[in-house]
Amino acid sequence: MLADKVKLSAKDILEKEFKTGVRGYRQEDVDKFLDMIIKDYETFHQEIEELQQENLQLKKQLEEASKKQPVQSNTTNFDILKRLSNLEKHVFGSKLYDE
């Protein structure tokens, strides 16, 4: 998936040879810069791998959680309101209607 989109690997960067000209760049500076790029590539590759694994785990957890959710019963809003009213009467008694 990702390998199709990325054109360079850390190994490609490491093994790249540049021709030198009369007034070319200092090879030591280029090597240091390429070393930094290689480290970044390796870090990015590792981070992508970890995120892909985490993504798979989360998808599995979501799938399992959706399977565990109970099927809703045929309780209607009227039933809920009736139960709530009975509970209020039981808890508050006549205080609820006196005020």
Curated annotation (Swiss-Prot):
Divisome component that associates with the complex late in its assembly, after the Z-ring is formed, and is dependent on DivIC and PBP2B for its recruitment to the divisome. Together with EzrA, is a key component of the system that regulates PBP1 localization during cell cycle progression. Its main role could be the removal of PBP1 from the cell pole after pole maturation is completed. Also contributes to the recruitment of PBP1 to the division complex. Not essential for septum formation. Residues 34-71 form a coiled coil. Forms polymers through the coiled coil domains. Interacts with PBP1, MreC and EzrA. Pfam families: DivIVA. GO terms for biological process: cell division; regulation of cell shape. One of its GO terms (cellular component) is cytoplasm. This is Cell cycle protein GpsB. The keyword Membrane does not apply. PANTHER family: CELL CYCLE PROTEIN GPSB, CELL DIVISION PROTEIN DIVIVA. It comes from Bacillus velezensis (strain DSM 23117 / BGSC 10A6 / LMG 26770 / FZB42). It is found in: Cytoplasm. Belongs to the GpsB family. Keywords: Cell cycle, Cell division, Cell shape, Coiled coil, Cytoplasm. Gene3D superfamilies: 6.10.250.660.
